[in-house]
Amino acid sequence: MKRPSGRAADQLRSIRITRNYTKHAEGSVLVEFGDTKVICTVSVENGVPRFLKGQGQGWLTAEYGMLPRSTGERNQREASRGKQGGRTLEIQRLIGRSLRAALDMSKLGDITLYVDCDVIQADGGTRTASITGAMVALVDALAVIKKRGGLKAGNPLKHMIAAVSVGMYQGEAVLDLDYLEDSAAETDLNVVMTSAGGFIEVQGTAEGAPFQPEDFNAMLALAQKGMNEIFELQQVALAD
């Protein structure tokens, strides 16, 4: 099996995390997984949604979108169509669920964190790149809140999280699929994990023949290997 990119089966794409990419948001990152590029921002606002009023905890919610020409052919903006597509809703819910799992909401205080992930160039793995980059932006946003005198109850961050894709390509488990691999993969998995080694979410679909338990285990093992490398890259970015 030869991957289109020439990478080894267990090799990530080149990953770059650039912090403070925009000047207005409390946390902002440009994350690059190969040719996939996503701007992730975290904005802080006082108050919480109505369903959390008086409960003494904060909230985090996420939105996701793709620029019209982030792909090979131009896609119409969802705003001009008047509604978000099912894929967009699914991805932004995944991002929100994943990042909430990193926080102790009771320590956040009466604030809402708005996470925005905007894909400026797509070459596979946009949702996993979004989660990985937004996590770093979230850490920076929490630091800003603390500097402003917030987080009196302590640091709400429980652990780092990151995400990566794995799949079965030409009968072999491969890590971090790009678009060419993703479009031809027999199976595609998106895995979200904590830095402590726990799983937050595993999304998997067989595109053709069902995958076998041994395939699933091989993909999970690759995801864990890749995730360890991604967590190191997050820490390097945060130390910069």
From Swiss-Prot:
<dbReference type="InterPro" id="IPR020568">
    <property type="entry name" value="Ribosomal_Su5_D2-typ_SF"/>
</dbReference>
<keyword id="KW-0548">Nucleotidyltransferase</keyword>
<dbReference type="GO" id="GO:0008033">
    <property type="term" value="P:tRNA processing"/>
</dbReference>
<comment type="function">
    <text>Phosphorolytic 3'-5' exoribonuclease that plays an important role in tRNA 3'-end maturation. Removes nucleotide residues following the 3'-CCA terminus of tRNAs; can also add nucleotides to the ends of RNA molecules by using nucleoside diphosphates as substrates, but this may not be physiologically important. Probably plays a role in initiation of 16S rRNA degradation (leading to ribosome degradation) during starvation.</text>
</comment>
<dbReference type="GO" id="GO:0006364">
    <property type="term" value="P:rRNA processing"/>
</dbReference>
<keyword id="KW-0698">rRNA processing</keyword>
<keyword id="KW-0819">tRNA processing</keyword>
<dbReference type="InterPro" id="IPR001247">
    <property type="entry name" value="ExoRNase_PH_dom1"/>
</dbReference>
<comment type="similarity">
    <text>Belongs to the RNase PH family.</text>
</comment>
<protein>
    <recommendedName>
        <fullName>Ribonuclease PH</fullName>
        <ecNumber>2.7.7.56</ecNumber>
    </recommendedName>
</protein>
<dbReference type="InterPro" id="IPR002381">
    <property type="entry name" value="RNase_PH_bac-type"/>
</dbReference>
<dbReference type="GO" id="GO:0000049">
    <property type="term" value="F:tRNA binding"/>
</dbReference>
<feature type="binding site">
    <location>
        <position position="87"/>
    </location>
    <ligand>
        <name>phosphate</name>
    </ligand>
</feature>
<dbReference type="InterPro" id="IPR050080">
    <property type="entry name" value="RNase_PH"/>
</dbReference>
<dbReference type="Pfam" id="PF03725">
    <property type="entry name" value="RNase_PH_C"/>
</dbReference>
<dbReference type="InterPro" id="IPR015847">
    <property type="entry name" value="ExoRNase_PH_dom2"/>
</dbReference>
<dbReference type="InterPro" id="IPR027408">
    <property type="entry name" value="PNPase/RNase_PH_dom_sf"/>
</dbReference>
<feature type="binding site">
    <location>
        <begin position="125"/>
        <end position="127"/>
    </location>
    <ligand>
        <name>phosphate</name>
    </ligand>
</feature>
<keyword id="KW-0694">RNA-binding</keyword>
<dbReference type="InterPro" id="IPR036345">
    <property type="entry name" value="ExoRNase_PH_dom2_sf"/>
</dbReference>
<dbReference type="Pfam" id="PF01138">
    <property type="entry name" value="RNase_PH"/>
</dbReference>
<dbReference type="GO" id="GO:0016075">
    <property type="term" value="P:rRNA catabolic process"/>
</dbReference>
<keyword id="KW-0820">tRNA-binding</keyword>
<keyword id="KW-0808">Transferase</keyword>
<dbReference type="GO" id="GO:0000175">
    <property type="term" value="F:3'-5'-RNA exonuclease activity"/>
</dbReference>
<comment type="subunit">
    <text>Homohexameric ring arranged as a trimer of dimers.</text>
</comment>
<dbReference type="GO" id="GO:0009022">
    <property type="term" value="F:tRNA nucleotidyltransferase activity"/>
</dbReference>
<dbReference type="InterPro" id="IPR018336">
    <property type="entry name" value="RNase_PH_CS"/>
</dbReference>
